[in-house]
Amino acid sequence: MTIGIDKIGFATSNYILKLNDLAAARGTDPEKLSKGLLLKELSIAPLTEDIVTLGAAAAEPILTAEDKEKIDMVIVATESGIDQSKAAAVFVHGLLDIQPFARSFEIKEACYGATAALDYAKLHIEKHPDSKVLVLASDIAKYGINTPGEPTQGAGAISMLISSNPRILAFNDDNVAQTRDVMDFWRPNYSTTPYVNGLYSTQQYLDSLKTTWTEYQKRHKLALKDFAAYCFHLPYPKLALKGLNKIMDKSLPQEQQDQLRKNFEASILYSQKVGNIYTGSLFLGLLSLLENSDNLKAGDRIALFGYGSGAVSEIFSANLVPGYEEHLSRTRLEELDQRQALSIADYERIFFEEAELDAEGNASFSGYEDQSFALAEIAEHQRKYIKVEKSS
């Protein structure tokens, strides 16, 4: 029995901030962002959009009524939690009308959380091969106006339906993880934005990659020559490119080195238009690779490197299933290009707006007509979500 990704989906906001505009407003050389980060645009989420609405929007298009009857576990991986007690997965479970006899919970470890969620889902399917697990990696990366991290913000969610006999990717039982207690990036409960030691975090990312990759090769007797592509956690694509350069085997035939680099370019196309989505960034890269590479084929082995500050890293691999390409979109880049670009003033107002509650903890919201799901109101401190009905 194989276990892996049977379906995969993605959702992001309808608003973008062009990094050339941000560079002009902040007095920064545009090439510092376009070449220094390899980013072009950032997804900007309004107040009515959060990890619940994005997660539900990513999942709804890929799920059938039969899927919703077979799903008995919903996991949301996030570091953008909207409640200290109630899991976002519970809200999503209700919005998607999934059958009631299911576990729903949240996983947190910075940007690593979704990789941990896949590990948990895989173990569950091993014991219950007829069930399905919905894994959502949903986050809003928000650093603040005129901060060093401002050009690496973003918003979005990846949905993955995990099952036996999957139709896209089959996991290999080869995971190698590493934990190191470091303070490269953190967000205390009292802060709405994170604290970042940027250079130190870059060093931790690259060293975690190098040491985990060395251990992975030693344990499994595999090398870079055994892989058609390598996907990385993508806080910004330039960091992942540094990672690829660090592990590149110069003894490989030039043709294979070129294939790995070409597939890396395919894997960053979506992130360049979305920005950082924390837990979902690795899997947005995977989706971008699968939908944009012109050289992958069934049976190819893909390596994946997950990293979450603090820090936990993990390397694992999966093989493409025959017919995988039939379950992917070929129009996503065009759809991303159709979103509304914001002025700097509108970006600052929309992205950093906070709910203004009255004395009883109430607030109502509007302007969410273009969303699939929305935070419509807060009533007595309770978040109320709706599925947005589209007018014909």
Q: Across the structure, where does each feature detected by a protein language model lie?
A:
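Short, well-ordered amphipathic alpha-helical segments that serve as non-catalytic structural scaffolds
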Residues: 29, 51-66, 88, 204-220, ...
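Flexible, glycine-rich active-site loops centered on histidine and acidic residues
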Residues: 126-159
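Conserved catalytic cysteine-centered active-site region
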Residues: 32-36, 40-50, 80-132, 249-281
